[in-house]
């Protein structure tokens, strides 16, 4: 050690340097920082494995991928954390270590004898010595140099601790040797990369090198070196113990230090943590030599324990961060407006390009087609017709009575500026008693004027409805939710002006009584408006706009009642979606139930107004059931006091799907009287049953005459004339019957003919059952109805033509076909063919062809047909039908008697068979008893 005074004078103050370094050592090694006693520890010998330098250098550079176990810290603190882990490997190293006490930890844990033994063992292993780059003058500062270069490598692995310490020491030695002959400067930068290159050049890889005892430091030299740091002149050059931030891939860090001109090793400022590295370099040799194996094993266990704790904490932090990210992303996803989900395309009907057949038809449609008798060839020839009739068949069979009300009567458009009348179901309807089967509307949706000769002048109070009454139209689909979400339509001034002729007390707008036909239109209009007040189910597109957030479309009334509901619904998360859906469905069902109850109360209230009070059984006597209609039984009775025959139709209101339609029928019939329409007498409500008293036609229906008698052309003309007269009246009121057939044409004993909305079904046979198997009786339907096209009042003219064929041949065309095949034949065949057309006169043929034109535009109207030659010249008087009515009635009575006798005979035969069976059983029992008695006697 040189005693150059200049060098000593330039060294920094020892106390100030040790205070800064000891504080860092306390944080890293658990010291208490209460003094510098560690500086006075005795020195011990040290060795340097030069062979390990090169391997350690390579391993240190290859360990660049190591990452910090603590994600909360930056990458630049990795080296400090790793050193902290290493320091825990030896509990003895928890003493204060200053920059001058190089091997104080070693001296405190091992005696000089153990160090000497270790040195001897190392010398025995590697006797070759290479001192080409090491001089005895520098031997006292080798360990300081090791500390100096330790900061150049900030990433290392625990398995390379011993090699790293030696490598750093050698790098610093070479570095010091390089700057030895330089001029003294205030600060010089030392790059450990260059030093690493120099040491590799100086030390061959193939030569194992280990230091001689000359490399060891004595306690005296260490104390001298420690004392050399006490000069306060170089306080401004006090080295920073904090490691600089490493660059990418752990590049060595340049450390600025001050070196004297002659002995640069004196000014080597040892950073913290190198003492532990130098110690572990020797402890790794001890593992190889087998000394202190128990202590090392405990150290290994403790080290692995600490590292596992670090890893677990790192995994927990990563898991928590990932869970936080996932939760935040889930919240973001919950608040994001999604696209439609769970969409299903159940059926896709296509056409095979080769065969031309439909592919992908629903199973129900396939069954209908196969059971209907429509062959594959027919399906291929008229594919679109098949599709239309299948849809129509399903609509007719699945529709309810309330929807039928919209299909029965005509539609009139409101004023253009009315937002409440945006769809046809929101329009007014004129109604008259239809039949028990379906009937369709033919009203206007465009408001185009028609000829005025079919209109009643009293209907001009509503110009828009009068002008566009007879434009052919189909019932439009149900209005969207926007219609139901609007304000109550019945209170709008536009609808008030349209309904200003209603005499009812239920109308919410001011009304002007009128005894003419406008009463019917206003009555039906009010019922239609009440229909619109029903809450509609939510439309799916409004849901998908905020999915998966549950929200519903509210009407203004609902929003006013619960203004906080939308805000609560928009905060929902996908996890609460099923609960929200269930609650929403429950609310909708509850609202529907309340609406049904409300409408039921309104229905009974309205019935009580239009019906008479009292018990009908006290006013009518001798009730005899003569038929069973679709909506109730039909009875005949005599009015007490006058002895007039009446027909009573009894209906259970709870079982009626079309209660509103029944009310409108009663109201229309009350205000309408026509000689060719069955007149309404009175109505009663008794114990939940509606009793409708009507004019009784004792001759029965035209069906009895057709099935039992043969009509002449004159008699057929009489029936056509009376029927057309009634249709003209209905059409003038904006009503179409849509179910004209022989069952709904009633006759009196004098031959008078009247239209009715129900048919007598006293004749129970196969033919009559076929007529009533399907609501709407497709055999009399017009092609435009079957093909789902727009239609108007001329559908009744087509039905009249089919009824003419029925009167000629005894049955309508296609009666023996299934209803679906009959619809197919009507749609594809057009005008049906007669069996014997040559037997008809030219006037009847012309009249029939005019009635059965496929195109509605070419078909005649009721007024035009009334002026036809066949009606004016060939048709006979009504009295000509009286003999046919009497004959048909006699035959019908005879059939009923025969049927009763057959039933009695069948009952007698069954009784005789049962008696014979009983006698046979008794005989067998007696025989068995006799046999048993004889056996007993023998015994």
From Swiss-Prot:
Span of domain Protein kinase: 620-871
CRIB domain residues: 337-350
Top-level division of the source organism's lineage: Eukaryota
Biased composition annotated in UniProt, kind: Polar residues: 44-57, 176-196, 204-231, 408-467, 500-527, 569-578
Region span, Disordered: 1-87, 176-299, 311-331, 407-487, 500-598, 899-939
Enzyme class: transferase
Acidic residues bias spans: 899-908
Mutation effect (residue 345 to A/D): Reduces interaction with CDC42
Enzyme Commission number, as recorded: 2.7.11.1
Annotated phenotype, changing residue 777 to A: Impairs autophosphorylation and mating efficiency
Keywords: Acetylation, ATP-binding, Cell cycle, Cytoplasm, Kinase, Nucleotide-binding, Nucleus, Pheromone response, Phosphoprotein, Serine/threonine-protein kinase, Transferase
Binding site for ATP: 626-634, 649
Modified residues annotated as Phosphothreonine in this record: 167, 203, 573, 773, 927
Listed Basic and acidic residues bias regions: 584-597
SMART domains in the record: PBD, S_TKc
Pfam families xref list: PBD, Pkinase
Active site: 739
Classification via InterPro entries: CRIB_dom (IPR000095), CRIB_dom_sf (IPR036936), Kinase-like_dom_sf (IPR011009), PAK3-like (IPR051931), PAK_BD (IPR033923), Prot_kinase_dom (IPR000719), Protein_kinase_ATP_BS (IPR017441), Ser/Thr_kinase_AS (IPR008271)
Record PTM text: Autophosphorylated and phosphorylated by the CLN2-CDC28 complex in a cell cycle dependent manner.
Name assigned to this protein: Serine/threonine-protein kinase STE20
Gene name tied to this protein: STE20
